[in-house]
């Protein structure tokens, strides 16, 4: 347990940010999963793809995902979408 006041604050802030990032990652994974399901079923594919790419871009902007990871995931979703058409 930290003794210095600033170190105590850092622990609190890190715990809060970790919780927030966990929630955002979970929502991102759900959005990607819904996009993949939409591609398989063929219903609302463009809407699901748009939502997934938007979520990936936001996650990359907020440093939840690395920008290259977000780009790779978007590319793979686009490839799957084009293959399904």
UniProtKB/Swiss-Prot annotation:
Q: Does the keyword Ribosomal protein apply?
A: yes
A Pfam family reported for this protein in Swiss-Prot or TrEMBL: Ribosomal_S20p
A single Gene Ontology biological process assigned to it is: translation
Q: Which keywords accompany this UniProt record?
A: Ribonucleoprotein, Ribosomal protein, RNA-binding, rRNA-binding
Q: Which InterPro entries match?
A: Ribosomal_bS20, Ribosomal_bS20_sf
Which residue spans traverse the membrane? Answer: none
Please provide, alphabetically and separated by semicolons, the GO molecular function terms listed in this UniProt record: small ribosomal subunit rRNA binding; structural constituent of ribosome
> Per its UniProt record, what SUPFAM superfamilies does this chain match?
Ribosomal protein S20
The organism's superkingdom is given as: Bacteria
This protein's GO cellular component annotations are: cytosol; small ribosomal subunit
| Annotated HAMAP family | Ribosomal_bS20
Family label = Belongs to the bacterial ribosomal protein bS20 family.
Q: What does this protein do?
A: Binds directly to 16S ribosomal RNA.
Please state what the protein is called.
Small ribosomal subunit protein bS20
